[in-house]
Curated annotation (Swiss-Prot):
Homotetramer composed of two homodimers linked non covalently. Interacts with M, S and E proteins. Also interacts with the accessory protein 7a. The record marks C133 as: Involved in polymerization. Residues 33-141 form the CoV 3a-like viroporin TM domain. Glycans are attached at S27, T28, T32, T34. It comes from Bat coronavirus Rp3/2004. This is Protein 3.
Length: 274
């Protein structure tokens, strides 16, 4: 207990020779040991602060986060927790090393360092994914894949759970019931409307890049969802160098969902003229 209480209040180290008092040949139990450390920094309060941040970090995972500022705040708290944990680990390790007590905690520190390295590598990979997607969403969302397409106005990047043969992209204008926002939705994720869709999208992962081509659309009158358009993409098996980009409106390469349908006779599955 004395050992852990001393470590809990560690600070700047003053090396002193260890002493054992009140020890006699007749008594091998009752003795007072002086640990050669003196505290000048409230290290224990720093540990308590990190523990409270870790509890808050874990508790925040059960709260539904929908807005971007909430996601950014949550990720910022996680980053602060990780940095404080790294600081506490290195600081306490140096103190124990100077005190000559490192061997007792070597395996614990090795495990903590390995976990920190894994966390740092994951952060680097997410940054690389941001560069591939031209968006900050890989840092905000924990998804492994992202559906991306790029226009002159905006770089779209929507989280996706796995690689599938078909992607269904929903577009709504928010005017009727069931009310859909004026945005693009895939699964439970959405992106605000800034520009139209393109006739091909790409799924980006850490080591994955899969291309999908627009195959067909379903209009709102075909599905029962008012004022919504569904864009259906199918996976391409061709190489990216052989993908031919077809524009639906003949010029811009994007589709504006607010435009009137350009099809003569919409059916349940209206094919897009390519």
């Amino acid at each position: 207990m004395d050992l852990f209480m001393s470590i809990f209040t560690l600070g700047a180290i003053t090396r002193q020779p260890a002493k054992i008092e009140n020890a006699s040949p007749a008594s091998t139990v009752h003795a007072t040991a002086t640990i050669p450390l003196q505290a000048s920094l409230p290290f224990g309060w720093l540990v308590v602060g990190v523990a409270l941040l870790a509890v808050f970090q874990s508790a925040s995972k059960v709260i539904a986060l929908h807005k971007r500022w909430q996601l950014a705040l949550h990720k910022g708290i996680q980053l602060v927790c990780n940095l404080l944990l790294l600081f506490v680990t290195i600081y306490s390790h140096l103190l124990l090393l100077a005190a000559g007590m490192e061997a007792q905690f070597l395996y614990i520190y090795a495990l903590i360092y390995i976990l920190q390295i894994v966390s740092f590598c994951r952060f680097i990979m997410r940054c690389w994914l941001c560069w591939k997607c031209r968006s900050k969403n890989p840092l905000l969302y924990d998804a492994n894949y992202f559906v991306c397409w790029h226009t002159n106005c905006f770089d779209y990047c929507i989280p996706y759970n796995s690689i599938t043969d078909t992607i269904v992209l929903t577009s709504g204008d928010g005017t009727t019931q069931p009310k859909l926002k004026e945005d693009y939705q895939i699964g439970g994720y959405s992106e605000d409307w800034h520009s139209g869709v393109k006739d091909y999208v790409v799924i980006h992962g850490y080591f994955t890049e899969v291309y999908y081509q627009l195959e067909s659309t379903q209009l709102s009158t075909d599905t029962g969802a008012e004022n919504a358009t569904f864009f259906i993409y199918s996976k391409l098996v061709k190489d990216v160098d052989h993908v031919q980009i077809h524009t639906i409106d003949g010029s811009s390469g994007v589709v504006n969902p607010a435009m009137d349908p350009i099809y003569d006779e919409p059916t349940t599955t209206t094919s897009v003229p390519l």
